[in-house]
């Protein structure tokens, strides 16, 4: 009897432990379902561009801006070009062989462009922020030793980053402060969080409440994508929602986000901006390239149906003004297919779609 009782007791103890561990596992799964990022199954990805006719580019009504390093009147320099979505009708908007213009961003109404200009040589070079009309006329300098500007959703303000050093640097994260420029008053207002530094690739959410940016080695972050309160000091790491990488961009309706997860992967996800901090759902890879190449600089089309990005050899520099021979502008329809819309490889990077104010194919901006 003693031996029988001992075996039974041992069996009950083991069964109890098994039940206990099973309950812990179930509770963990429930917690994961509610608290962890929801990652969808991957769509079928192609590691090389598809033939151009696989996406009907001609039906896309929006133009695209991009930076490119090429010959201008017998001199190699960076210029800002505009093209149709199918790659036709290339127009040089800047045409300044003695300056370098880069990082174009179209205003929400499609009438203006903000960008950066490098002037000078060597370490005496200075990067400044400008804006101009979409046809290249009436250029206005708004900040010296500044970089990576973006528009407010109403097109009345431009956010930009101050340079970290007085001496010129090509590092994208060489930034020290976020500043808001009011186009009506001409005033420069520092962001409430004055500790922001080493952030780059900023974008302003359509509801006007958030900035999204990448950070490198700043504010106790290594590499991350951050959500920053536009009118407060709060900073939230999007990694808790499965967002890792750099250079985020939001759709015009504020419902989706895209970013580069690695040098070879681009992602999209649903985003909820209604709460006290943004939440990300349904993370999905949409582009993956060969390890010998890179994909960078994502930008949603105004109707949210396409994403433009840069693609080229891994030896190219993805930073603003970084030489990237062989790089071209590409477009994906979010189905896994992507095509090149430029083919000359003239260091073509940083694409940005130009909205059409009268277009009825996408929702109006939030009021």
Where are the predicted features?
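Generic alpha-helical structural signal
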Residues: 7, 24-25, 79, 343
